[in-house]
Design a protein with these regions (language model features):
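Alpha-helical transmembrane segments and their helix-start/interface "positive-inside/aromatic belt" motifs
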Residues: 1-19, 117-133
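Extramembrane terminal tails and long inter-domain/linker segments of multi-pass membrane proteins
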Residues: 2, 45, 86-118, 203-219
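Domain-level detector of nuclease and nuclease-like folds
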Residues: 102-133, 137-140, 144-153
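Transmembrane-helix bundle segments that line or gate the permeation/cavity pathway
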Residues: 23-32, 77-91
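Alpha-helical transmembrane segments of multi-pass membrane proteins
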Residues: 18-33, 138-143
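N-terminal first transmembrane alpha-helix
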Residues: 6-24, 35-41, 45-47, 58-66
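Perimembrane loop-to-helix junctions flanking transmembrane segments
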Residues: 36-55, 156-166
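A structural feature that tracks compact, well-ordered secondary-structure segments
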Residues: 49-82, 87, 132-151, 163-201, ...
Length: 219
């Protein structure tokens, strides 16, 4: 168990933090939504019922969507683009391990590398593909949740307007929800790319060595 915790500590801690934050968001969202229902003279709903509401679904996947888009684009952009002095960039002049051709004879090579062909080609791009698939799923669920929330709010206000999914995705409300998260995610990536040029964190693989010159590029 001690070995398992040592080898997987980073992912385990991040899972715990994510679950706690998500649970907190759902709980306070439930109270917030019931407060809104109370304002309109409607009865409160249970936590389980709240999980199926647009208020809950939209708030969760609106944020997940931007995270997966950010990571997918970042993975692709760092293949060809550079930033002098940043620990997040590949070297400007020296070849990188990640650019060499995969060898099926390398010890412990994953089976797609040994298989070759289209399987290898897919595996070579599997990280960005996975992020964009997760982005697409989250984008769709955000739209579903946002539509339910939009129509629910109209019903509470006594409005007769009921939109379809495609109609809702064409509204400024939907794109405001998306873009306000997208810009913040890209700003956070820009921050670590630029700040890692000048600032250090001893012991972190996201930082250059403390004594590295500012113009040294890569980790």
């Amino acid at each position: 168990m001690k070995k398992f915790l040592h080898e997987n500590g980073l992912s385990l801690v991040l899972i715990v933090i994510t679950v706690i934050a998500l649970a907190g968001q759902i709980l306070v969202g439930w109270y917030d939504f019931n407060g809104e229902l109370k304002d309109y003279g409607r009865p409160a709903i249970t936590l389980l019922t709240y999980l199926t509401t647009g208020h809950c679904i939209e708030s969760v996947f609106e944020n997940w969507e931007s995270e997966f888009l950010q990571m997918g684009l970042y993975v692709l952009l760092t293949v060809k683009l550079f930033q002098k002095g940043s620990s997040e960039s590949k070297s400007l002049s020296e070849p990188e391990e990640v650019d060499r051709e995969p060898s099926p004879t390398r010890r412990g090579a994953p089976w797609p590398v040994k298989r070759g062909g289209w399987v290898l080609k897919l595996y070579e791009n599997s990280l960005s593909i996975a992020f964009f698939l997760l982005f697409g799923l989250s984008f769709y669920l955000h739209a579903i949740g946002g539509l339910k929330e939009y129509n629910t709010e109209n019903a509470l206000k006594g409005k007769q307007e009921i939109l379809s999914l495609w109609q809702f995705m064409g509204t400024s409300a939907f794109w405001f929800q998306s873009l306000q998260n997208w810009q913040s995610e890209f700003l956070s990536v820009l921050s670590i790319v630029v700040l890692s040029i000048f600032l250090r964190q001893k012991g972190s693989p996201e930082s250059k060595p403390v004594d590295a010159p500012n113009d040294e590029t890569g980790e």
